[in-house]
Amino acid sequence: MKRNYVYFLFTYLLTFVVSGCDTDIEPEVIQAANTYNEEYYQNLREYKKTDHAICFGWYAGYTSEASPSQGLHFTGLPDSLDIVSLWSGIPSNNPAYVETSYYNERYLPTAYEEMNYIRTVKGTRVVMCTICRIGSTEFPKTDAGIEAYALHLARCVLRNDLDGLDLDYEPEGDWLQNDNF
């Protein structure tokens, strides 16, 4: 009888131990993405059209498309950002574009979609960034060369349907500095 009681107790405990084991990995939301309704985004777009202090920022972290971090995605930028300057090239949806593209386009389809999302949904303007440096280009160091360089930059903005150009003036001895700027 005592032996049957031990077997019964062992079987009873084993049943709970086996049924209590859960080997399935259960996804757990640690931090859910903020979601807003269309009214919020409409108000945001309308606010950005008003006369207000502008929030401008440079952004270069969008080249790691597989990252789970929102800090590496356009969608992670603050809603209050009015203008963002592209410091890592221009995201493109065209696989023919490579990093050495004449217009500095880069094939980054996810970043391209996210960039268009913040433009259309959040009303954030996106501008191309370049440092005024004509000496390292094929443009001649003349007034005509400066004009050709300006046309090149304008074509780059227009070709990629961007909202403008961020010309960075960083004095470092290039011909397109000082009196020629």
What are these regions (language model features)?
Residues 1-5, 15-51:
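Bacterial Sec-dependent N-terminal signal peptides
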